[in-house]
């Protein structure tokens, strides 16, 4: 949408269908969303400044002042997309959060979850949303501390939001999902532990300032994992590395030298496409 002059909106009673995703994306001046009380399909209950679908109590569209009330059951695809929210509180009632719910929300710096929520948790000081058993980190933000005990970092968990210069993934983490740290331009160095068993495709793509990667786990680097990391110049790979996927280092314009362990028996021909790599030992 991107209507920067839009300051309020009222959804009339005759509206029966609203498209997927946040219809108010990047409407940064919009502080008020109201749905007519006589609308049979949608409401803005509890003055939440959002649009909720009545049939399943799913929040589908928001603005910068939207609050998630304890009468909302689900956060839909891209429902907060492009908003400038800083704080997220997940109440007890929410049982479903789309992995795309907070796409484009790069200014989040505080996350909490109600202790009574049966699906999600947020350990004190973590500023993250985790699965109830604490093993999967589903959503992080600029100030997240990855708790000990986390075994998986979900798809798009930190997309564009991680703000620390050194990313040190804790031991015990076994998997990093697709796009998990994509477009996190603050990251300068990434240290990936021996415990890793899988890195999803595109996991670090477009991290513009990522310069150093230390991979300690003998795994396969997935397709496009470090694609478009224009500053990447130093990559440390362990003995036992199994392979390097399609365009794993695509367009890494600063990568001139890399030492590939003899154990890596499967390296896709275009793994280093558009890289100035002149030496691959």
Give the residues covered by each predicted segment.
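Consensus positions within tandem repeat domains that build extended binding/scaffold surfaces
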Residues: 21-22, 77-79, 99-101, 155-157, ...
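Structural signature of tandem-repeat unit edges
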Residues: 3-17, 27-49, 57-74, 82-96, ...
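Short acidic-glycine loop/turn motifs at beta-strand connectors
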Residues: 53-56, 131-134
């Amino acid at each position: 949408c991107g209507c920067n002059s839009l300051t309020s909106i009222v959804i009339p009673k005759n509206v029966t269908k609203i498209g997927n995703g946040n219809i108010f994306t990047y409407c940064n001046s919009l502080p008020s969303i109201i749905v007519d009380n006589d609308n049979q399909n949608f409401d803005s209950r509890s003055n939440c400044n959002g649009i909720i679908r009545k049939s399943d109590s799913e929040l589908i569209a928001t603005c910068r002042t939207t609050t998630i009330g304890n009468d909302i059951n689900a956060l839909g695809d891209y429902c907060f997309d492009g908003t400038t929210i800083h704080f997220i509180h997940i109440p007890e009632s929410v049982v479903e959060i789309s992995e795309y719910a907070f796409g484009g929300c790069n200014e989040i710096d505080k996350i909490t979850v109600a202790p009574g929520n049966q699906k999600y948790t947020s350990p004190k000081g973590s500023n993250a949303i985790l699965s109830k058993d604490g093993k999967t980190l589903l959503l992080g933000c600029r100030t997240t501390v990855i708790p000990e005990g986390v075994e998986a970092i979900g798809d798009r968990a930190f997309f564009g939001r991680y703000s620390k210069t050194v990313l040190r993934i804790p031991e015990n983490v076994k998997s990093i999902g697709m796009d998990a740290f994509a477009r996190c331009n603050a990251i300068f160095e990434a240290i990936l532990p021996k415990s890793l068993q899988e890195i999803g495709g595109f996991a670090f793509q477009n991290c513009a300032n990522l310069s150093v990667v230390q991979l300690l786990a003998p795994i396969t680097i997935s397709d496009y994992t470090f694609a478009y990391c224009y500053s990447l110049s130093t990559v440390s790979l362990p003995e036992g590395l199994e392979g390097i996927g399609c365009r794993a280092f695509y367009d890494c314009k600063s990568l001139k030298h890399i030492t590939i362990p003899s154990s890596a028996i499967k390296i896709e021909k275009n793994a280093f496409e558009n890289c100035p790599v002149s030496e691959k030992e």
